[in-house]
A protein has these predicted regions:
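A cross-family phosphate/adenosyl-ligand binding-site feature
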Residues: 3, 13-85
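Electrostatically charged, flexible surface regions
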Residues: 136-241
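Active-site metal-binding loops of divalent metal-dependent hydrolases
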Residues: 9
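Alpha-helix C-terminal capping segments
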Residues: 78-83, 112-121
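Glycine/threonine-rich flexible loop motifs
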Residues: 97-106
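Short, Asp-centered acidic motifs that coordinate Mg2+ and/or phosphate
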Residues: 88
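Short beta-strand segments
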Residues: 6, 32-34, 91-94, 125-126, ...
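Glycine-rich phosphate/pyrophosphate-binding loops
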Residues: 116-136
Length: 241
């Protein structure tokens, strides 16, 4: 299996070497990651200026590039720039959960979406802000579940969030609602500083990614890049001549 690893936390992400070692058990690994932190870049790509791509030898025996652009551009460069094919794109492990509507802003999730748009299977991995040990300890369990149920034959992208601390089990989930929002206090000189605030409301519905993760369950959500409201489309299409 040929595997591409990317992220939005950059080449300096502390968990990256550990994820690489785990992925090497699955196949041949290539790493193409942002040169600098790219959290919150969503699905942005660079259209108006060139960006730097550098080969580096940070991880012995693993071909590695840094890209001075977004996570989506890392995937685009790997597939369209290098003209290579990958069986799986792994994005992460992100420092911070990508659940609820935060998925829309996530560079981690968007890199996985870009991979799917370019014909690959993709896995987005995230955990909390405090530690990565729990996530690393449960990667085998997540992978075995994906393989046991042949899930990549049923969907192209899975968004996986692994809670910190004690893990109670695994739940297949759907995307939840808002988790964070922002306030914009003025800091003078016509500047405002976006300040995240938690707006999550617990519904104790463990079929929702936000509730599942915050109650100690690994959340596995099948996502799609398609944004059409298909039930409404089928209804409206009857009005077409």
């Amino acid at each position: 299996m040929r595997i591409l690893i990317t992220n939005d936390d950059s080449i300096s992400a502390p968990v990256l070497p550990f994820l690489i070692q785990w992925a090497k058990k699955l196949g041949e690994v290539t790493v193409i990651v942002p040169k600098f932190e790219q959290s919150g870049k969503s699905h942005s790509i660079e259209l108006h200026k060139p960006f730097e791509v550098l080969a580096c030898d940070r991880f012995p025996g693993v071909r590695t590039y840094t890209v001075d652009s977004s996570p989506a551009d890392c995937v685009r460069y790997a597939i369209l720039g290098l003209r290579e094919k990958f069986d799986l794109v792994i994005s992460g492990i992100n420092r911070g959960y990508n659940i609820g509507t935060d998925i829309l802003y996530s560079g981690t999730a968007s890199a996985a979406f870009e991979a799917v748009c370019l014909g690959c299977k993709a896995l987005a991995l995230s955990t909390g802000f405090e530690e990565f040990d729990t996530a690393l300890a449960h990667l085998d369990e997540v992978w075995e579940m994906l393989q046991k149920h042949d899930l990549f034959a049923k969907n192209d992208i899975y968004n996986v969030n692994i809670p910190e601390g004690e893990v109670k089990g695994v739940r297949f989930t759907r995307q939840g609602g808002p988790f964070y929002s922002d306030e914009f206090p003025s800091i003078g000189d016509n500047l405002v500083r976006p300040t995240g605030i938690c707006v999550y409301k617990d519904s104790h519905d463990y079929s929702v990614d936000t509730d599942a993760v915050l109650h100690g369950y690994i959340s596995i959500s099948p996502l799609i890049p398609q944004r059409t409201n298909m039930p409404l489309f089928h209804e409206l299409s009857k009005l077409n001549p």
